[in-house]
């Protein structure tokens, strides 16, 4: 097995609730991350994760699966358009609430589960 680097970014402050539109203040964070990732060989997976609260009042997203995938795509697009990272090395995935870090029974647990993870694999 090869080594992996996992960068975990909390969604608080990065997206508006129920949206995949990046907040402008979050863009510099993704740009810095992308510039760092461009220095490493290997593949990059951008994963979107949500809590277990269903998406409400959204015509665009029918489920947390849709929302998590769209957030991963939005994050990857930001990195690719603002850095020298090669697009052929980047993949996206949405996992909805299937890989929680914490309980979904508390506000703090749900907040921890809403995140973007960027995984760098040297294979």
Regions found by a protein language model. Give the residues of each.
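Periplasmic OmpA-like peptidoglycan-binding domain that tethers envelope proteins to the cell wall
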Residues: 8, 14-28, 49-123
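A general structural motif
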Residues: 37, 41-43, 87, 113
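Short edge beta-strands and adjacent turn/loop segments
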Residues: 1-8
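Short amphipathic alpha-helices and their capping/turn segments at secondary-structure boundaries
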Residues: 1, 30-39
